[in-house]
Amino acid sequence: MLSFLWDLASFIVALGVLITVHEFGHFWVARRCGVRVERFSIGFGKALWRRTDKLGTEYVIALIPLGGYVKMLDERAEPVVPELRHHAFNNKSVGQRAAIIAAGPVANFIFAIFAYWLVFIIGVPGVRPVVGEIAANSIAAEAQIAPGTELKAVDGIETPDWDAVRLQLVDKIGDESTTITVAPFGSDQRRDVKLDLRHWAFEPDKEDPVSSLGIRPRGPQIEPVLENVQPNSAASKAGLQAGDRIVKVDGQPLTQWVTFVMLVRDNPGKSLALEIERQGSPLSLTLIPESKPGNGKAIGFVGIEPKVIPLPDEYKVVRQYGPFNAIVEATDKTWQLMKLTVSMLGKLITGDVKLNNLSGPISIAKGAGMTAELGVVYYLPFLALISVNLGIINLFPLPVLDGGHLLFLAIEKIKGGPVSERVQDFCYRIGSILLVLLMGLALFNDFSRL
C-alpha cells in the first residue's frame, strides 16, 4: 500500500510539473502576442484553489490532475466586446497563433534541457560499459565481442556508460545492423565490430537491449559464499552458516551464484545435496527449499544472502560538468531523446515496434515512483524523458493536439482562409476517437503487465 501511495504521489508531482510547464509555454507566448488569457488551469473538474491577477487571468488548480488548459479570449467561443477584439486569439496573425500553439511543446523541450542541466551539474553516477560475459551463440558472440571489452561508441555516438549504450541500442530496433566501437578495458586501441540485427528478437517492455544481444555487463562479483543466514529459514534448518562456501550442488561444481539461485527457485520442497567448505574443512548437507508463490507457480526460497564484492572504482564513472559545458551536454542529451522518440513512434507505425510496447499512466507512475525513490539525479532524467515524449506527441498532426491546430493553421496560410468550422469539428471528433483508442490500448498494456 505504501509503495502504491509513493508511486501515486510521484506520478502526480511529475504530471503537475510537466503540465504546468506545457501550459505555461502557451500562456507566456499568448501574453507576449497581446492575447487576453482568461484562465490558466492545472487539472480538470472542481477547483481546489483559484486566484485572479490584475490582468483578469484566473489561475486554477483543479481536482483531476490529468491535464490542463489555457483559456484565451476568442470570438469563436463567445461574443467579445469591440474594445477587446484586438486581444482575441482568433484575430491574431497566423504566425502569432502558430507561435502560441507551438510554445507548449517547445516549453517541454526547454524543461528537459533544464532538468538535464541540473543533473549534469550535480553529477550523474554510472558504470563504464565493460563486458562481463558473452552468451554462447548470441549476436555479440557472433561478432566476436569478448569479456573485458569496453563498448566505446554505437554508430559513432560515444557511450560513456551503460545507460548511453542502452539508449543507442533501442534506436536500432528494426535496423539490419549496427556498428559498435570497442576496445580492451583501459586501452585506446579501438576497432569497429558489426552486429547483425536481422534476427534480433528484442521487445523493449520485456527485456534489456544489452542482455538481448547476449552481453552481460561487468558488475559486482557475487561469490557462492554466504554473508547472512536468516533464522528459522530452510538454510538455517539445513545447518548452513554465514561464511560457508558452496562448492557443489547435487554433485555438480558451483562457480556462479546465479546458478545456485536458479536451482533453489526451480526445486521448492525438493532435496538438494550440498557440498560446502567451512573454515577450510569440507562438509555435506541436505537443503530443502521452502515453497512460496511467484508468477503463477511455486518457487523455492531458502533465506540466505551471498557475499558481494563491490565493483572496483575504475569501472565507475560520474558525468559532471561546469554550468556552461552542462548546457551543451544537456542540449545534446535532449536532442538524442527527441530523435529516439520520433524514431520509436515511426517504428510503431511501420510495425517494427509492437503496439504492446505502448505504456500508459500505470507504467509511468511506476517509473515515477522508482526513480523518485532512487533520488533527484534519477527523478529529473525521468521527468525530462516524459517531458520530451509529451512535447513530441503533442506535435503530432492529430486534431485535438497542438500538432493538429498547427496543421489547420498551415492550411489556412496556404489557402488564404481558415478551415471551415464543420471540417474542423469532424476532424476533432475523429481525432478524439483515435486518442481514446490509443489511451485504451496503453491502459490495456499496463494492466497486462501487472
UniProtKB/Swiss-Prot annotation:
A Gene Ontology cellular-component term: plasma membrane
Start and end residues of each PDZ domain: 127-220, 222-309
Effect on the protein of changing residue 399 to C: Decreased substrate binding, retains some proteolytic activity
Transmembrane intervals: 1-21, 104-124, 376-396, 430-450
Swiss-Prot/TrEMBL cofactor(s): Zn(2+)
Gene inactivation effect: Essential. Depletion experiments lead to cessation of growth, elongated cells and limited lysis, as well as decreased amounts of sigma-E. Not essential in an rseA deletion strain, when sigma-E is overexpressed or in ompA-ompC deletion strain. In the latter has severely decreased growth at 20 degrees Celsius. Accumulation of an RseA proteolysis intermediate.
Effect of residue 214 to E/Q: Cuts RseA without previous DegS cleavage
SUPFAM superfamilies named in the record: PDZ domain-like (SSF50156)
Function of the molecule: A site-2 regulated intramembrane protease (S2P) that cleaves the peptide bond between 'Ala-108' and 'Cys-109' in the transmembrane region of RseA. Part of a regulated intramembrane proteolysis (RIP) cascade. Acts on DegS-cleaved RseA to release the cytoplasmic domain of RseA, residue 'Val-148' of RseA may be required for this. This provides the cell with sigma-E (RpoE) activity through the proteolysis of RseA.
Note: Regulated intramembrane proteolysis (RIP) occurs when an extracytoplasmic signal triggers a concerted proteolytic cascade to transmit information and elicit cellular responses. A membrane-spanning regulatory substrate protein is first cut extracytoplasmically (site-1 protease, S1P), then within the membrane itself (site-2 protease, S2P, this enzyme), while cytoplasmic proteases finish degrading the regulatory protein, liberating the effector protein.
Protein name: Regulator of sigma-E protease RseP
Organism classification: Bacteria, Pseudomonadati, Pseudomonadota, Gammaproteobacteria, Enterobacterales
Gene responsible for this protein: rseP
